[in-house]
Regions:
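Active-site anion-handling motifs in enzyme catalytic cores
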Residues: 1-361
């Protein structure tokens, strides 16, 4: 089956690139032909400011404001682009139309993973695109591990009305967080399955193959942070002192260095003695590589994506509160891996069943 994937931009985003890589790898293993459609959109700053001002006036709220999209095509770290070109089959699309289905001979579309259903991350027509508003009724439509980014409802009434109609056209919907199951039911009137982020459908060995050529590093505390701040570094310093190990830091987004690579990022988890992170995918890869970790929550919210997975795996004690480290104890990885294997089987089953069914069954 030829499957078109819609997800967030590759950008300077380790997690965004890797979740798409993982989903394609899984679909390939299941015998399908995946193709990711990358948005080629560039908003002027003026247009973004006007859209933001309009939303503030309309909602009289500062919640859920659109994030300025600092991208245009494949602008970004050259090493990241090299990884994408080598490992992810993708095409750049400016306008999403029904003609895409015929042009690429697609049998199905899948939306996900990552925060594909968060309005602030999908300006203008992109939110409708993420609900496949351009796809006709003949093609199969699924979401896999779609995320709203938080448990609060951020849609305007107009967005909710439009997207709920589109969501009802899907053959099957799956989401990444438990709260998203409720949001789908309460606001879209649709049932959704809870599944794992696609990165968790691959195992440690799959990622080790990618970083095989990276030399082994000395033992260290690995800090991977969306924004390296005092809270993250305070925790890392305490653990560094307790374990007498150096700290290695990598940042996401605009702080990615030109020499950084996806392969080296995998190797940091492979070789780390301990991980401190405020990132969802930082937490995920600590689990995949069975590394003890501490997660520093974002005080501004959006933490449900962490809590949903940690609670499923019995790892809630890894959350840092008020910079107090509650547990440096080793994790019972045998128990965690057993739980993960059950969840992995259920998530794989969602893809197997729904892509094997005929559209409309």
């Amino acid at each position: 089956m030829k499957i078109g994937i819609l997800t967030q931009h590759f950008l300077l985003n380790y997690g965004g690139i890797i979740q798409n890589f993982a989903l394609q790898q899984v679909l390939l293993k299941l015998g399908h032909e995946p193709l990711t459609f990358e948005h080629d959109t560039c908003y002027s700053r003026t247009r973004w400011l006007l859209r933001t001002a309009k939303q503030i006036l309309k909602t009289r709220s500062l919640k859920g404001l659109p994030v300025y999209p600092v991208y245009q095509g494949r602008v970004g770290n050259k090493n990241f682009i090299k990884f994408v070109l080598k490992n992810i089959r993708s095409v750049t699309v400016k306008d999403f139309t029904s003609g895409l289905t015929q042009k690429y001979g697609l049998d199905a579309y899948v939306v996900g993973s990552d925060q594909v259903w968060r309005p602030a991350f999908n300006l203008g027509p992109r939110l409708g695109n993420m609900f496949l508003n351009f796809a006709d009724d003949k093609v199969k439509k699924l979401s896999y591990a779609a995320s709203f980014g938080c448990k609060e409802w951020e849609y305007t009434k107009e967005q909710e009305r439009a997207c709920s109609k589109l969501a009802r056209r899907f053959d099957a919907i799956s989401v990444r967080e438990a709260s998203a199951v409720d949001l789908c039911k309460n606001h879209f009137g649709v049932d959704a399955s809870l599944v794992l982020d696609p990165t968790l459908l691959l195992n440690k060995e799959d990622y080790e193959k990618v970083c095989n050529d990276i030399p082994k590093k000395e033992k260290h505390i690995f800090v991977y942070s969306l924004v390296v701040g005092e809270s993250v570094m305070s925790v890392a310093s305490k653990i560094s002192e307790a374990k007498n190990l150096p700290i290695v830091v990598k940042e996401a987004g605009g702080k990615v260095k030109k020499e950084d690579t996806i392969e080296d990022w995998f190797a940091e988890f492979r070789d780390a003695e301990y991980v401190v992170t405020d990132s969802f995918h930082g937490m995920v890869f600590s689990i995949i590589f069975n590394k003890p970790f501490s997660i520093v929550m974002n005080p501004s919210g959006g933490n449900d994506r962490y809590i949903s997975l940690l609670s499923q795996l019995g790892l809630m004690d890894r959350i840092i509160k008020d910079n107090q480290i509650s547990s440096l104890e080793s994790i019972n990885w045998v128990g965690v891996n057993k739980k993960l294997e059950v969840l992995r089987h259920e998530s794989m089953n969602f893809l197997k069943v729904n892509f094997n069914q005929t559209h409309g069954e």
